[in-house]
Amino acid sequence: MAESMDIIELIDSDDRFGPTNALLPASGRTDLKEWQKSVQSLLRTLQRPRYVATGLLPEFQQLDARNAFIQNNQLPHYDKAEWKSSDMSLQEKLQIYADAMADDPAPLIEELNARLVALDDIVYCEHYCTEGGLSLDDVDLWARLRSITVIGGVDWPKGLRKYMDNISELADVPTYDGMAI
């Protein structure tokens, strides 16, 4: 995500790409960062297997691409170094992803729903997450929230859902609701 944010900042500040400064800089809000940290493991467990399982995202339509994603993106309770070690085969990783998809997601989704309610309380309004206008905070947060839409059964708080839909429309980038599993 850090490299993507660097690219966005470059494009937004260089007039070769069009009008500049369309986005306010990141605010440095610690509450947003804390929320993101609080759901990291939960989202990895729910999202990553679903990305691969949908088969609908262009980047996962080829078997080699799905395998590369699985090879490089650990699920909890593995750390990155352990996951990437040569001690774990692709077959073992595929099985871990399959097991994650087979597990009942209801308890994790219930926890996620509660965390979304907490986030709804700190998102400034339905048009941007930080007071002052559209900023790099929105680019970061919306991308993370968009990835949640691949998870079926999530109950979005009304304000947060409006925020998601507004940014989706503004950016002309759809959510994954239609392929949620």
Language-model-derived ranges and their functions:
Residues 1-78:
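GST-like domain detector, emphasizing the conserved glutathione-binding G-site
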Residues 8, 12, 33-36, 113-116, ...:
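Non-transmembrane alpha-helical segments in soluble domains
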Residues 61-63, 67-101, 180-181:
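Alpha-helical membrane-targeting segments
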Residues 153-158:
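Structural helix-adjacent loops and short alpha-helical linkers that scaffold large soluble proteins
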Residues 21, 47, 124-131:
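Short helix-to-loop capping/linker segments positioned immediately adjacent to catalytic or ligand/cofactor-binding
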Residues 129-150:
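GST superfamily/GST-like fold recognition
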Residues 166-181:
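Charge-dense, extended regions
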Residues 81, 85-128:
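A mid-sequence, solvent-exposed acidic-amphipathic segment
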